[in-house]
Amino acid sequence: SQGDLSQLTLAKKLKELLDRAPRKDYKMSIQHFAFSNDEFFDFVRENNLSVNISALAAYMDIWPMWEKAGLYPKHFLTQNFLRLKDVIDDSHFELSIHSDACNMPTRPLYGVYKAVTRRDDEDQEISDSRVQTIDVVTGIRAITIEAAKQNRNEELFGSLEKGKRAS
């Protein structure tokens, strides 16, 4: 669900399902989080939903290509692109960073580097109209415990505790 409309549609569907069958133990995850808008964030917040965001931070490597090709309206690339700081600043969201083997090297720290620096593959800073960088600790959590929680595996791995697997 890379686009802003798909994310809002998913959030509305979640609200509809929870209205029909309320429960507290649900998990909703949005994969390939790329473009989002204020309407999505506001809807989630206003309806007190909880959404796990799984971002592919390596999208920053292809951002310049999108910009040069004019594939997206300018506001998509300067205001709505990988709003990771907005995610971590809002208690209605959890952030994990993932790696699609075909899109990004399967090196988790590469994703953290991208999320922390917001630099493309030519080491140029992404030109956002608002700050969307995250700190290193949040980035490490996003590839460890938050990634494990998203898949309901936090009892098995994701943190350094006795009895957990290193993975």
Task: Report the location of each language-model feature.
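Glycine-rich phosphate/oxyanion-binding loops and their immediately adjacent helices
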Residues: Q2
